[in-house]
Amino acid sequence: MNTIWLLLASNVLMTVAWYWHLKSPASVPLLGFILISWLIALPEYGLAVPANRMGHVSLGGSFSAAQLKIIQEALALVVFLIFLLVVLKEALRWQEYVGMALIMTGLGVALSGRTRYAAASVKPAITEVQP
């Protein structure tokens, strides 16, 4: 579960880094927005990298790399949706809600049977050296 919380926190930082400037005045130079966004995004790596290592089956976690990516994308979508509605105050069209529902359905499909998949098809990245 720590994997999910770390991925969630990393997605909050990344969403803020990518979209906060849309509510900022246009008088600020683009380079300023880029530098501030980079400073917000940098700590995101400090959360995402450990989350992926902790969650990967080859390192004792429960997920394949593909499953981790799909989880990350689903979390990014949820975080973005909240940011869009609360901070940017933009409305979504029904087509966008349907598109998001399809992505979440894909998450369900990808995670179904994950323990069997992870145990059977992913080889450990770290093995003991045989003398």
Protein language model annotation of sequence segments:
Residues 1-131:
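Polytopic alpha-helical membrane proteins, predominantly small-molecule transporters/carriers
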